[in-house]
């Protein structure tokens, strides 16, 4: 977690019941997959209860979680019982010192234990690593997590949002060239790995796969099927812009429930149809979003 972040009071956060109202409306509008992200979602007390509540909504086919992994092993049995379908674990380095510098905590062992626990449980597991220029050895060590584990190790181009603006974007074109040099038998993996934009590759002899999510150098906005709901109830169509809709204001309005449901549906539908055609991260002056990723969720 970066230093100097804005801490949100509990009164500003959507309650579980309010989140369920939004997701139920989203399901009525045709959305079927939900991912709980952060910040760190497992810091939210009783999160497995929310997972179960979301799984019980008609039309919701899948609920997944993105976590830093530190609390995952502890909560995994309860999450599985609640019906969690898959988990993404954020891990940028397997080197203890580098991990501590990035996260501020010396808890790499807990994350690695969580990865093994997730694999042992059978839940679909992916590793999300932001593509930082930490040297080739760091990259190979991350990829080797997929050697004896049935997981996807995915490299994600740094998004120039919040603290991400302070880092150069590490090109996946260069990264793929390095992959092919080290693994000459690397092949494209055409198997279905989910509903996201990652392009996957397989190394012979490895149980898992490698994925590249190239938001900057491999722009996939024409295929983007996502909207984001912040913890405070703001619905966003694109990470690049500060546009969207304040759903918390509607959820807490003093009006009849049927009017509130109608207002919520109309507002969400309008926000979805107003989703920008493409991001503008190539042109920094056009980016209007000022929040950090931990505030937005991702």
For each predicted feature, which ranges?
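Radical SAM enzyme [4Fe-4S]-AdoMet core and its adjacent flexible, acidic
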Residues: 97-100, 105-209, 215, 249, ...
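Canonical Radical SAM [4Fe-4S] cluster-binding loop centered on the CxxxCxxC motif
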Residues: 1-15
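Short, flexible helix/strand-to-coil boundary loops that buttress conserved ligand/catalytic motifs
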Residues: 1, 76, 103, 239, ...
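Radical SAM/AdoMet-radical enzyme domain recognition
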Residues: 13-36, 43-156
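Short, solvent-exposed loop/turn segments at secondary-structure junctions
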Residues: 8, 45, 73, 162-163
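Radical SAM enzyme core and accessory elements
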Residues: 219-298
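Short capping micro-motif at the N-terminus of alpha-helices
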Residues: 210-212, 237-238
């Amino acid at each position: 977690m970066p230093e100097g972040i804005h801490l949100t009071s509990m009164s500003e956060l959507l309650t579980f019941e309010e989140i369920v109202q939004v997701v139920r409306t989203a399901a009525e509008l045709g959305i079927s997959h939900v991912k709980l992200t952060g910040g760190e979602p497992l810091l939210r007390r009783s999160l497995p209860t929310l997972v179960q509540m979301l799984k019980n909504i008609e039309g919701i086919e899948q609920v997944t979680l993105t976590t830093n992994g530190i609390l995952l092993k502890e909560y995994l049995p309860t999450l599985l019982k609640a019906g969690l379908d898959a988990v993404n674990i954020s891990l940028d380095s397997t080197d203890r010192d580098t991990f501590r510098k990035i996260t501020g905590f010396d808890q790499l062992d807990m994350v690695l234990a969580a990865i093994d626990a997730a694999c042992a449980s059978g839940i679909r597991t992916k590793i999300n690593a932001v593509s930082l220029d930490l040297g080739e050895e760091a990259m190979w060590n991350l990829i080797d997590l997929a050697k004896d584990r049935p997981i996807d190790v995915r490299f994600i181009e740094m998004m120039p949002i919040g603290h991400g603006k302070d880092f150069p974007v590490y090109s996946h074109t260069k990264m793929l060239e390095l992959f092919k040099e080290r693994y000459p038998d690397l092949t494209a993996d055409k198997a279905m790995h989910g509903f996201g934009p990652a392009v996957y590759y397989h190394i012979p002899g490895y149980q898992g796969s490698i994925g590249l999510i190239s938001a900057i150098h491999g722009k996939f906005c024409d295929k983007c099927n996502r909207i984001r709901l912040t913890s405070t109830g703001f619905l966003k169509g694109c990470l690049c812009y500060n546009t969207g809709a304040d759903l918390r204001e509607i959820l807490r309005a003093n009006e009849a429930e049927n009017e509130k449901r109608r207002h919520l549906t109309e507002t969400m539908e309008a926000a979805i149809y107003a989703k920008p055609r493409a991001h503008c991260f190539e042109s920094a002056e056009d980016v209007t979003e000022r929040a950090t990723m931990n505030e937005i969720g991702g």
